[in-house]
Regions:
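Two-component/phosphorelay signaling modules centered on CheY-like receiver
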Residues: 12-31
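Acidic, metal-coordinating helix/loop segments flanking the phosphotransfer/catalytic sites
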Residues: 32-50, 67
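Receiver (REC) domain active-site loop signature in two-component systems and cognate sites
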Residues: 57
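Short, glycine/charged-rich "phosphate-handling" switch motifs in NTP-dependent
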Residues: 101
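C-terminal output helix
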Residues: 108-117
């Protein structure tokens, strides 16, 4: 059975590279969104096993999107991992305090992204 991954990033190129890299793993099923608002709808409808969420997006940023996901009963328990260039220890701890399961550094290596995601899917 495959694990559903929702990848959210406002940058088309990054979103496409991430989706292609993740789809190389036959155990991952991937959908993408370009905004926090799209992510809220997709998460409620599709119920992914994990959401990979860009921190800095126009409109609704990653932390705001995470907060909205946590407010809704249908999405409040979906794990979220932030994708960000902001990886200093205090920032990472701040993201975890908001409810993120972890952080993947941006830019990421497309060849190791699926392995990182699998690590977050483990119970």
């Amino acid at each position: 059975m495959s694990s559903r991954i929702l990848y959210v990033d406002d940058e088309d190129d990054i979103r496409e590279v991430a989706a292609m890299a993740l789809e190389l793993d036959p155990d991952l099923e991937v959908r993408t969104c370009a905004s926090g608002a799209e992510a809220l709808a997709a998460a409620a409808e599709w119920q992914p096993a994990l959401i990979l969420l860009d921190v800095m997006m126009p409109g609704m940023d990653g932390p705001t999107t995470l907060g909205r996901l946590r407010e809704r009963p249908e999405t409040d328990d979906i794990p979220v991992v932030f994708i960000t260039a902001r990886t200093q220890a205090q920032e990472v701890e701040g993201f975890k305090a908001l409810g993120a399961k972890g952080v993947i550094a941006k830019p990421f290596d497309p060849m190791t992204l699926a392995a990182q995601v699998r690590g977050y899917l483990k119970p």
